[in-house]
């Protein structure tokens, strides 16, 4: 299985998700900024790309919604989960309009977040 790519400027969120997914034997690759993800996508072969992408919506140097748009241009079938501490309706609507698989408000319940990631992985495996 390809890694789950996690994008968040908050190191503690990345750490918690990495550890929780490692317990589920799900590989991860983490990024701090959206630009790192775009560069990695441009450099990655099909087998090196993400199984799914989990991204914060608001980060210094870029928006998760802008990243969603760029990722969907490159990998239209890739499930993308958008996380945000700003659980407002406008952000959720924008995420879904941009093609997000799901919207995860922070703070999140870790078991529910892991369950959502499993569902996204299953969806991506159906797309392959």
Task: Spell out what each predicted region is.
Residues 39, 65-76, 94:
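Short amphipathic alpha-helix used as the core "switch/output" element in two-component signaling
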Residues 32-33, 63-66:
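Acidic catalytic/metal-coordinating carboxylates
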Residues 2, 11-29:
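Two-component/phosphorelay signaling modules centered on CheY-like receiver
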Residues 46-54:
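Active-site beta3 strand of CheY-like receiver
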Residues 90, 104, 108-117:
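C-terminal output helix
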Residues 25-40:
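Short hydrophobic/Thr-rich beta-strand motif most characteristic of the beta2 strand and flanking loop
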Residues 14, 60, 84, 88:
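The feature encodes the CheY-like receiver
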């Amino acid at each position: 299985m390809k890694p789950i790519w996690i994008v968040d400027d908050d190191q503690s969120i990345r750490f918690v998700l990495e550890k929780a997914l490692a317990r589920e034997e799900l590989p991860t690759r983490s990024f701090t900024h959206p630009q790192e993800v775009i560069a990695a996508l441009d450099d990655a072969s099909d087998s090196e790309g993400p199984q799914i992408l989990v991204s914060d919506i608001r980060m210094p140097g870029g928006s998760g919604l802008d990243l969603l748009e760029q990722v969907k241009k490159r990998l239209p079938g890739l499930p993308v989960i958008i996380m945000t501490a700003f659980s407002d309706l406008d952000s959720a609507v924008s995420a879904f309009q941009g093609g997000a698989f799901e919207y995860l408000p922070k703070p999140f319940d870790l078991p529910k977040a892991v369950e959502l990631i499993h569902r996204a992985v299953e969806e991506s495996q159906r797309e392959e």
